[in-house]
């Protein structure tokens, strides 16, 4: 096997792992919203996602999908997003910008998968 040189730091590797894993889970679940590829995401999104992964990799990480969803909502509101019935990346509207209890079971499951992927990345991606 040839040499593999990765230019990403640890947080970037973990972020890509979690993001791509969550995207694959969304595809497998036939979710109505499947994220664009990591390299196609706008820089403010990637920067906030890296902060989420940093937080999820330390001792102050969110332990529950509900807690993580609340943090996700705060991050999206800070980036200028708002609630809308139909997802529109250009208009910055998202149907999941609602309290956790109002999410569908599919969206709750996606949040649980995200928490699990963060834990796998924290322990096993180096």
Give residue ranges: language-model regions.
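Alpha-helical propensity feature that highlights long, continuous alpha-helices across diverse contexts
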Residues: 1-126
